[in-house]
UniProtKB/Swiss-Prot annotation:
It comes from Aliivibrio fischeri (strain ATCC 700601 / ES114) (Vibrio fischeri). This is Isoleucine--tRNA ligase. GO terms for molecular function: aminoacyl-tRNA deacylase activity; ATP binding; isoleucine-tRNA ligase activity; tRNA binding; zinc ion binding. Belongs to the class-I aminoacyl-tRNA synthetase family. IleS type 1 subfamily. Binds 1 zinc ion per subunit. A motif ('KMSKS' region) lies at residues 617-621. Zn(2+) binds at residues 915, 918, 935, 938.
Length: 952
């Protein structure tokens, strides 16, 4: 016999080396949906302990971006890992469907409601537009391998959800948290609507910084408050000086505010050149800086007074014909300015609070479009930001402008329009943070939640401690109505508001939100009441829509109908970007505490934003945008999923072509490891060929033990949401424990041992156990590839890997086992040391390959005792044709030191002939009649009982 190739156990599998994921994944997706994979998972997990990850709804507008992909893939990985851990973990994806961005898109095509199109038609067009956007995003998410209730997602515009949003408002009102007030709110003049805190972002803006004089109305009364030397009361006009960066708010000024405990100085500005004599009141600490910037060099102090002494003194408005009082406020500081604060209660939260205390007029001369109202003296019809220059001109004319310069500062902007916003007092509906103890209860509930990372707790506590009332009303067309009736004269809520809300909710459940605008009040409350009450026509903040989904979705959908005793909270986990501490996490917490007295979630996990390889934000103008569709079309979704799982997503997450290439390289290593397992399981039937654990070759037992240890760590990391630890452990297992050692050592035995003999079957048993575990470790992350592996594995099995649980067939090495982990760790160290010398010998042309070598190991007694346990099988571990062990005392001069203490190695080229079958150089090659080209071991493996392997 001269061709021994057919006698080898060569690897064979239908699992290709190349993933070709971009082409193959869509075929797998089709099968998943044709065979209802998600439905199969639900059936398999029915009755198991529940795990609810509630999906924060993305906005139904535009294509998905890489941040969406990161978020949805993270959720999908966690859901799938929980499923494998034996939980019933449904996933109902959601969409936020009301609000301004959708209105703006529809306005472009159809015009503004009430002009070219009726409000009812406009709402219908918004609904159609949002539905189309949902469908587009849905297909993109499905392509990423995300499993869920895609046929029945939740949309905040679904009639049932809209009805439940209205019911949520009723519950909050019933608990005493609803408030109507005329208050300053963040107002976007482009939106023409109030904004929630979460809709405000801060950007740098250049504004005029001005110091303005308010002349004392009663000079004598003002002077009397200062401890001036007798007869030295100074000369010139007497004024307080305020500082502001919003000159446009001066028409609404109704007071100047001082701090009760601050010291104020009366400064005499001396006549000098063009400088007229005048007297200025300033905070002592700030006087020098104010005078310096006004280029006033010649001055002296006349006297001092406490802020509390100056309360209720009157000063002339700088350009209107009325006086304003000096009032006291804790918000006044000496951080900047003059120590005296211009107070316009209609244009600032602190001004409003202090104005209420002094019963000041809440002047609001600005319309919803940011233009001064027609009756605004001097400035009617001007846009407020353009009016700054006009205000400065008037101040100069009146001689009231002490100083001005351009000032760059952080200023609130609309998150949609990216334009500066204003504070504007309007009648609005609020959820009060304090009138029924909501703030205190919310802060208490924060402590009951597990925040990951931990800093999330401090962040949200700080935000809740400092936040104003939640303005929930909007002056928009496309939104859930604030379905309340108020008395036409007293503006009080109808006494039966809760019952009326339920009636409206039932109508909305049937016909959608348009029902509110269509219904006649008399139908709900009778003619008599209808004559005295009117509908509220405002809509709800979209953050309210999404914030109450713990009730409108989780508490209401059949998918989440788990036993009450399992449900400590509506959801187990909320997982979103770190910006949601001020957004969805907070709106959900506040609404849930207001409705139910407890947090809506047990755990909150946040991820960072996606940046490019240089840490820059994604931007079309920079050209660094990575689109999910481009990645899936080029590399496949599994590469994107592996990228997500490989990052420490609690910080910023970097992505670039180079980073994705690294993910693709890591993927190839894992895929090739899996392919080795599958190819070497050819001809193996688990039903008949499994070798009992106690009869397995020692090295095979060790490999299964390593898989057992890896699985424990991997499951723990999945449970703790440390996905990058999962991928690190997976890579280490595949590349180091398997690839660099075990798989390398077993190739000889696997390929050359007797087909179906104990030596081969022991090895295949280990490979089978390991791939059964490996495919499950991979499934949450590389879902497509895991499915592909699953379908190539031997033995009877369920249709999908995703319906099962972690593999239970692995075992750990028994305690006290002779060939334990410590033993194999030392053997690997010996092998690594020998390998370095083999490489050197190859470089020096002493040998061609490792199998041409014979090595002699000179070792100390302790090491010899370990190495000799492998007997003649040491050579198989070292991949050499022969390996001899001798005491250190017999070391020859040619033996070289290794990195291991107590080990020297001599490498020599074997003089024996090469076996044509196993390629080992063995002395008995050519001595066996009829088999002159092969060694005795191969003859036994081909025609005899096969070699015996105990250790390796």
């Amino acid at each position: 016999m001269s061709d021994y190739k057919d006698t080898l156990n060569l690897p064979e599998t239908g699992f290709p080396m190349r993933g070709n994921l971009a082409n193959r994944e869509p075929e797998m997706l089709k099968r998943w949906y044709d065979e209802d994979l998600y439905g199969e998972i639900r059936k398999a997990k029915k009755g198991k302990k529940s795990f609810v990850l509630h999906d924060g709804p993305p906005y139904a507008n535009g294509d998905i971006h890489i941040g969406h992909a990161l978020n949805k893939i993270l959720k999908d990985i966690i859901i799938k890992s929980k499923t494998l851990s034996g939980f019933d973990a449904p996933y109902v994806p959601g969409w936020d469907c009301h609000g301004l961005p959708i209105e703006l898109m529809v306005e472009k095509k159809k015009g503004k409601p009430g002009q070219k199109i009726s409000a009812a038609e406009f709402r219908e067009e918004c609904r159609k537009y949002a539905a189309g956007q949902v469908e587009g995003q849905k297909e993109s998410f499905k392509r990423l391998g995300v499993m869920g209730e895609w046929d029945k997602p939740y949309r905040t515009m679904d009639f049932g959800t809209e009805a439940n949003i209205i019911r949520s408002l009723g519950k909050i009102a019933d608990q005493g948290h609803l408030l109507k007030g005329f208050k300053p709110v963040h107002w976007c003049t482009d939106c023409g609507s109030a904004l929630a805190e979460a809709e405000v972002e801060y950007q740098d803006k250049v504004s005029p910084s001005i110091d303005v004089r308010f002349v004392a109305a009663d000079e004598a009364a003002t002077l009397a408050k200062f401890s001036t030397p007798e007869g030295h009361q100074g000369e010139g006009e007497l004024s307080v000086v305020i500082w502001t960066t919003t000159p446009w708010t001066l028409p609404a000024n109704r007071a100047v505010a001082l701090h009760a405990d601050l010291e104020y100085v009366l400064v005499q500005v001396e006549a000098h050149g063009e400088q007229k004599a005048q007297r200025l009141i300033l905070a002592s600490e700030l006087a020098k800086s104010v005078l310096d910037r006004a280029n006033i060099e010649h001055y002296h102090n006349l006297g001092f007074a406490k802020g509390s002494d100056l309360e209720l003194l009157q000063f002339n408005h700088p350009f209107y014909n009325f006086t304003v009082p000096a009032i006291l406020g804790e918000h006044v500081t000496t951080d900047s300015g003059t120590g005296i604060v211009h107070t316009a209660p209609g244009h600032g939260q602190e001004d409003f609070v202090v104005g209420k205390k002094y019963d000041l007029e809440i002047a609001n001369p600005v319309g919803s479009n940011g233009v001064y109202l027609p009756d605004t003296e001097l400035f009617a019809g001007q846009h407020v930001f353009k009016a700054n220059d006009s205000v400065l001109e008037v101040l100069k004319e009146k001689g009231a402008l002490l100083h001005h310069h351009a000032y760059e500062h952080s200023y609130p902007h609309c998150w949609r329009h990216k334009t500066p916003i204003i504070f504007r007092a309007t009648p609005q509906w609020f959820i009060s943070m304090d009138q029924a103890g909501l703030r205190a209860k919310a802060l208490e509930e924060v402590k009951s939640v597990e925040w990951m990372p931990e800093w999330g707790q401090n962040r949200i506590e700080g935000m809740i401690e400092g936040r104003p009332e939640w303005c929930i009303s909007r002056q928009r067309t496309w939104g859930v109505p604030i379905a309340l009736f108020v008395h036409k004269e007293t503006a009080e809520l109808h006494p039966d508001s809760l019952e009326l809300i339920e009636k409206v909710a039932k109508l909305v459940e049937e016909k959608g939100i348009q029902a509110w605008w269509d219904v006649d009040a008399a139908e709900l409350m009778g003619e008599e009441d209808a004559a005295n009450y009117e509908k509220v026509l405002d809509t709800l903040d979209v953050w309210f829509d999404s914030g109450v989904t713990h009730f409108s979705v989780v508490d209401s959908r059949e998918e989440y109908n788990f036993p009450e005793e399992e449900r400590t909270h509506s959801a187990d986990l909320y997982l979103e970007g770190s910006d949601q501490h001020r957004g969805w996490f907070q709106s959900s917490l506040i609404s849930s505490v207001a409705m139910k007295g407890k947090a809506p979630y047990r755990q909150v996990l946040t991820h960072g934003f996606v940046v490019d390889g240089n840490g820059r934000k994604m931007s079309k103008s920079i050209g660094n945008v990575v689109a999910p569709k481009d990645v899936t079309n080029k590399l496949g979704a599994d590469i994107l999923r592996l990228w997500v799982a490989s990052t420490d997503y609690t910080n910023e997450v970097a992505v670039s072509d180079e980073i994705l290439k690294r993910s693709a390289d890591a993927y190839r290593r894992i895929r090739n490891t899996a392919r080795f397992f599958l190819a070497n399981l050819s001809g193996f039937n688990p039903a008949t060929d499994i070798v009992p654990a106690e009869e397995m070759v020692a090295l095979d037992r060790w490999a299964v033990g390593r898989a057992f240890a890896a699985q424990q760590e991997i499951i723990k990391s999945y449970d703790e949401y440390n996905l990058h630890e999962v991928t690190q452990r997976l890579m280490h297992f595949c590349s180091i424990e398997m690839g660099s050692f075990y798989l390398d050592v077993i190739k000889d035995r696997q390929y050359t041992a007797k087909k179906g003999g104990h030596a081969q079957r022991s090895c295949q048993t280990a490979l089978y156990y390991i791939v059964e575990a490996l495919v499950r470790w991979m499934a949450p992350i590389m879902s497509f590839t895991a499915d592909e592996i699953w379908n190539e594995m031997p033995g009877e099995r369920e249709k999908f890997v995703f319906t099962g649980e972690w593999y239970q067939g692995l075992f750990d090495l028994a305690e006290g086992e002779e060939f334990n982990n410590e033993f194999w760790t030392e053997i690997q160290a010996v092998r690594a040391s020998v390998n370095k010398l083999l490489e050197a010998a190859r470089g020096e042309k002493v040998i061609g390959g490792a199998l041409q070598a014979e090595v002699t190991l000179y070792a100390d007694d302790a090491l010899i005792a370990k190495i000799n346990k492998l007997e003649d099988e040491l050579r198989f571990v070292l991949l050499t044709s022969a390996a001899t062990v001798k005491p250190l005392s017999e070391k020859t001069e040619s033996a070289k030191a290794t990195e291991l203490d107590g080990l020297f190695v001599d490498v020599a080229a074997s003089e024996a002939a090469k076996c044509e079958r196993c390629w080992h150089h063995v002395a008995d090659v050519g001595t066996i009649e009829g088999h002159e080209e092969v060694c005795g071991r191969c003859v036994s493996n081909v025609d005899g009982e096969g070699e015996e392997r105990k250790f390796a």
